[in-house]
Amino acid sequence: MKTSELRQKFLKFFETKGHTVVRSSSLVPHDDPTLLFTNAGMNQFKDVFLGFDKRPYSRATTAQKCVRAGGKHNDLENVGYTARHHTFFEMMGNFSFGDYFKRDAIHFAWEFLTSPEWLNIPKDKLLATVYAEDDEAYNIWLNEIGMPSERIVRIGDNKGAKYVSDNFWQMGDTGPCGPCSEIFYDHGEEIWGGIPGSPEEDGDRWIEIWNCVFMQFNRDEQGNMNPLPKPSVDTGMGLERMAAVMQHVHSNYEIDLFQDLLKAVARETGAAFSMDEPSLKVIADHIRSCSFLIADGVLPSNEGRGYVLRRIIRRAVRHGYKLGQSKPFFHKLVADLVKEMGGAYPELKEKQAQIEEALKNEESRFAQTLETGMALLENALAKGGKTLDGEIIFKLYDTYGFPYDLTADICRERNIELDEAGFEREMEAQRARARAAQSFKANAQLPYDGQDTEFKGYSERQTESKVLALYKDGEQVNELNEGDSGAVVIDFTPFYAESGGQVGDVGYIFSSENRFEVRDTQKIKAAVFGQFGVQTSGRLKVGDSVTAKVDDEIRNANMRNHSATHLMHKALRDVLGGHVEQKGSLVTAESTRFDISHPQAVTAEEIAEVERRVNEAVLANVAVNAAIMSMEDAQKTGAMMLFGEKYGEEVRVLQMGGFSTELCGGTHVSRTGDIGLFKIISEGGIAAGVRRIEAITGLNALKWAQEQERLVKDIIAETKAQTEKDVLAKIQAGAAHAKALEKELARAKAELAVHAGAKLLDDAKDLGAAKLVAAQIEADAAALREIVTDLTGKSDNAVILLAAVNDGKVSLCAGVSKPLTGKVKAGDLVKFAAEQVGGKGGGRPDLAQAGGTDAGKLPEMLVSVESWLCQKLS
């Protein structure tokens, strides 16, 4: 049964039981600040369970997309190395909001799992757990379902406190809670592991496939369990786990959905396809979480959800690099994912281009530092030692963009510990530097009770002023000496204080005897401006007469960008629609950054039209006029106002001919022609329904255009293209040739491995009942598997154990010719071998792989195999 069929079957079953099929909620939880990402089916119903929300249905069923990466629920480091850890997964669920309870929940689960009409899983492959005190659930399983008592396991308070158990669920320290009953599937005795509650429960034999949570109580602040008037049910079935059961495979990565993605990863990286290669699994998993997160409005950034996404992308790119792919490849997998899951989740198809673009941009950005960062890391690791220094970890993070867990991932592969304390010291030092740099911002709430500042900056760039107050280290002082950082308050100021998205002015406050460099201007109070900076010469005292002068070049650049922002705002509303609202802005001398409400990516055509309209207004060179008027009069002009902004009784209205009318207190050009060339250089989403646009003006825009022109010419020269139009064809032809060469190289390596294996079989030790090959060779894990498979296929009585050492780690592969597997099992052999070299392993009777950490024990281990085999054969 395909994964897509299983998903539909589940929803259909519960629909026949009176459940409303509710579509998956976004991965970005709305109105729940406690969650980084949606990580369970019940998240979208949390307020229903708490009684804050009512739905027109009392039974629901969902296929919920979930992400567990970052925050409390973080599976990132295990992904690729286990059979069932994922950053993205689908949770199938059925829910009762005060409708049915334990009896129906258990009966529904059992019917769906075991009925011939639905999944038809053999009943003797299933086991149930219940909370130790939940006699009601126990009796339903025993007397109504008919499950033998030895297959019903009571789980008590196994987490160190009352009602703290694997089988007792709670939303928080207080609130809804209750026992749960889990259903486990037996993957077979050839897999190591024991039943829940046993010492071997962490093994992979018994796997949880279903969890019924019975919200039965409300825990108060005293810890009392008060029965809920309307008990509810929340159940979950992991789609990938159940697909593995239905497809008779052990690992989630062996199901149809992942097999197709793994093949796509191998295709795009040029790597040999192997189920024993963790990097293939990492990338196949990560393309799912990254694509779905971007589809739901998350974009790579340095904070919050965006940073988690960035970490996942960079981990995938690093694993591609590990497989030998140094070119951007990750974004090319989106099309394969859309083919697999676009039917169930149409947002993937709708936003495919946006997802590909976001991934490609992040790949390209990281590619610039990945190789250099890896070289730094390799040099550090080559020096030996069991721990990577915290300074190196920080440098990788700060300079080369390596998230901490990416470095940890690499070190884990080499059995190297991380100096976490040293890294934290470096991080704290960086935070301290940042605090020092920001220590003179207005948010320091400097004490001041003197006269207000009179702002002259609309019409004057220089004023003759008097020093009213001085500050150092957040305290009021009488003087500032050379080298002191501090703040200055003067009676008349030409410096604009940061407000409305425009940064504060910079410049100088000086006299014949001293000079204070103004690096920022902030409001200390509503009408009191503080000039923050450094006393570069002399001594400045309260009461001094000084000259205050704004840096003209930076002020002019700020004005150009601020005026351009107004024109862009109007053009965006005209092109995209009246729903566009300003959500934030940052106007600096370098650029203008403008955030707007818009549900989707702004297309290239729309951006071009916005640019055309703004530049048209610039060429018109109309006057820019500002007037102070009452709010009532301002409204009559049709001036644009920001939703939620608080305005006074009098406001400043800025008009740019017939192009734009808006309330604004910032500084602006005299005529629109002063803006110069206007160019949008980036557009992207920063939150669900919010887009960020960055634009540049004047000489900055000209410089950008010239750089683009130089880049195109360099590409033409590098590709030896005749014209710009020929470049793409040249690049595509080169890429196709390189890909063909990579495939040819992979085939050649495989052939060499097979030839090397044939020599091993010729030299095998004949033990009568079996021919033994136990040897160390030079090969990677994939090649080991291929050689062993080839050798056991050429003989009726071969027992093969091959070992290799790569990057300090031991790889083992065991194989047994099928006629011999009744006496000798490859899984037993590889387990015996792995234990001697510091590892673990297991697998099928005919083929099994494992790893180890102690390469020094290899010779001794290989010698011991003969006596082990003789014992098995006797």
Swiss-Prot record:
Q: Where are the transmembrane segments?
A: none
Which keywords label this protein? Aminoacyl-tRNA synthetase, ATP-binding, Cytoplasm, Ligase, Metal-binding, Nucleotide-binding, Protein biosynthesis, RNA-binding, tRNA-binding, Zinc
Output the SMART domains linked to this UniProt entry: tRNA_SAD (SM00863)
Q: Which InterPro entries match?
A: aa-tRNA-synth_II/BPL/LPL (IPR045864), Ala-tRNA-lgiase_IIc (IPR002318), Ala-tRNA-ligase_IIc_anticod-bd (IPR018162), Ala-tRNA-synth_IIc_core (IPR018165), Ala-tRNA-synth_IIc_N (IPR018164), Ala-tRNA_ligase (IPR050058), Ala_tRNA_ligase_euk/bac (IPR023033), DHHA1_dom (IPR003156)
Cellular component (GO) terms are: cytosol
Q: Which residues form a coiled coil?
A: none
Annotated catalysed reactions: tRNA(Ala) + L-alanine + ATP = L-alanyl-tRNA(Ala) + AMP + diphosphate
Any binding details for the cofactor?
Binds 1 zinc ion per subunit.
According to the UniProt entry, its GO molecular function terms are: alanine-tRNA ligase activity; aminoacyl-tRNA deacylase activity; ATP binding; tRNA binding; zinc ion binding
The protein's location, in the record's own words, is: Cytoplasm
**Might you give the EC number(s) for this enzyme?**
6.1.1.7
Which Pfam family is an annotated match for this chain, by its short name? tRNA-synt_2c
The residues listed in the UniProt record as binding Zn(2+), with positions renumbered to this chain, are H562, H566, C664, H668
UniProt cross-references to HAMAP family, sorted A to Z: Ala_tRNA_synth_B (MF_00036_B)
PANTHER family cross-referenced by the UniProt entry:
ALANINE--TRNA LIGASE, CYTOPLASMIC, ALANYL-TRNA SYNTHETASE
Comment, domains: Consists of three domains; the N-terminal catalytic domain, the editing domain and the C-terminal C-Ala domain. The editing domain removes incorrectly charged amino acids, while the C-Ala domain, along with tRNA(Ala), serves as a bridge to cooperatively bring together the editing and aminoacylation centers thus stimulating deacylation of misacylated tRNAs.
Protein name, per record: Alanine--tRNA ligase
What lineage is on file? Bacteria, Pseudomonadati, Pseudomonadota, Betaproteobacteria, Neisseriales
